[in-house]
Amino acid sequence: MESTARLETPIAPPSFDWRQLLRDFYDLSKPGIGFYSLLTTATSFWLASTVFHPVLFLHTLIATGLVTCGGGALNQVIEIEADSQMRRTEKRPLPSGRVSPLTGLLFGVLSAAGGVLYMLLFVNGLASLLAILTLGGYLFVYTPLKKKTHLATLIGAFPGAVPILIGWAAVRGSLGPEAWALFAILFLWQIPHFLAIAWMYRKDYARAGFPLLTVIDPEGNRSALQILNYTLALVPVSLLPTLLHMTGAIYFGGALLLGLGFGVAAIRAATQRTNTTAKQLLYASIIYLPVILVLLAVNKI
């Protein structure tokens, strides 16, 4: 009787881990990209403001965050097979099987579409159009081209720099030379930043079939040239906000010093071409962008 009772005892179903699910959706949204998108949007919003409107600011960040989260999720849905072949991405929610492709697709579509609609309703039409261009360029141009040409890195830098235009458009309803100067800074910054990653993980990218510059040119000659060109071009371009009377001397001096420091890291990476110098360049890029955005914000004229 006792053994029969034990057999008939129901087995409790495994408990649902809400915390793991939240972590998975957090990872699905590509929080690193989201952080930089929100930071650049917030900075350009502040720079464009003569009178700061906190409610509009909040609406702009919410909409941008939703669009960025949706784009990140949809990108991972598209690249699930490639991600499963790369060591740095194989543990992401989709390739690991923790989140189903359908769930990822629904999350991405709802977030992206919700963000665009929210932007249209609570910010303005130009900001909403820019959000659509960001999504379209990222998902339908950059993502498929990554499997076909190394030029995808350059092309992807365009939608990658659009969030800084969204903040400006949210305030002004138009894009002047000041906004395009900010766009140029963000555009140029992305190339050495991504090439540093591409060099460090070139074997991973080759395994997944991505013909990145670091894959098709294993000696690194062309990658080195691009790293140098774009990093050095960033130095004078980063001074444009002062020349356009957006910022003062503190920003000018800080941007010059940051650019020179970034340039030193770029020269080391381009000449030595090791994973160590590529990692140093990556760290330099990670430091450069938030610091220069803070300088823009605090030394606004």
Q: Where are the regions that the model predicts?
A:
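Multi-pass membrane catalytic core of lipid/isoprenoid biosynthesis enzymes
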Residues: 80, 88-129, 218-242
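Structural signature of hydrophobic alpha-helical transmembrane segments
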Residues: 119-133, 186, 249-258, 299
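Cytosolic, membrane-interface loops and tails of multi-pass inner-membrane proteins
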Residues: 3-20, 78-99, 195-223
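Membrane-embedded alpha-helical segments that form the functional core of polytopic membrane enzymes
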Residues: 39-80, 88, 112-116, 129-140, ...
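Interfacial loop-to-transmembrane junctions
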Residues: 219-222, 263-291
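Transmembrane alpha-helical segments that form the membrane-embedded catalytic/substrate-channel core
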Residues: 66-74, 136-144, 185-202, 235, ...
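Small-residue-rich segments of transmembrane alpha-helices in multi-pass membrane proteins
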Residues: 39-42, 92-93, 155-171, 222, ...
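Intramembrane alpha-helical segments
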Residues: 101-171
